[in-house]
Amino acid sequence: MVKKVLLINGPNLNLLGTREPEKYGTTSLSDIEQAAIEQAKLKKNDSEVLTFQSNTEGFIIDRIHEAKRQGVGFVVINAGAYTHTSVGIRDALLGTAIPFIEVHITNVHQREPFRHQSYLSDKAVAVICGLGVYGYTAAIEYALNY
């Protein structure tokens, strides 16, 4: 079982709770992060969830590199718009060889065509999209039991 999971959120996800609530709901990123941390504590086996959010691609890449040094065993990532553009984030995930799940709050396949392409999906253990913020709960649960 994985003891340390890193939850990464990319650009504009810091606006959750206020950004387009008809699409993303009213749950804040802070609420999502706190729920993930509590979910790990409920395991009562010293599991932990670390959280990180950045609007900057390079900072996300640096955090993935740091995760390897910290002994993170699984990454749950909502790369936001970088999902559709970032070879750098893909390469960081592959370079560290940390297994990961890609999460999206909305069903990206029901949205604009440019959102249908993911640079991460083909390398992810799983992709969860369209389940709202519950997608994070499902991904964290899987990661903690990996």
Curated annotation (Swiss-Prot):
EC number: 4.2.1.10
Cited HAMAP family: AroQ
Chemical reaction(s) catalysed: 3-dehydroquinate = 3-dehydroshikimate + H2O
Gene: DQD1
Disulphide linkage map: none
Molecular-function GO terms, alphabetical: 3-dehydroquinate dehydratase activity
Record-linked Pfam families: DHquinase_II (PF01220)
The keyword Lyase appears for this protein: yes
Family classification: Belongs to the type-II 3-dehydroquinase family.
Protein name as annotated: Catabolic 3-dehydroquinase
Superkingdom of the source species: Eukaryota
Top enzyme class: lyase
Active site per UniProt: Y24 (proton acceptor), H104 (proton donor)
Subunit comment: Homododecamer. Adopts a ring-like structure, composed of an arrangement of two hexameric rings stacked on top of one another.
Recorded metabolic or biological pathway in which this protein acts: Aromatic compound metabolism; 3,4-dihydroxybenzoate biosynthesis; 3,4-dihydroxybenzoate from 3-dehydroquinate: step 1/2
Keyword terms of this UniProt record: Lyase, Quinate metabolism
Residues at which substrate binds: N78, H84, D91, I105, T106, R115
Function text: Is involved in the catabolism of quinate. Allows the utilization of quinate as carbon source via the beta-ketoadipate pathway.
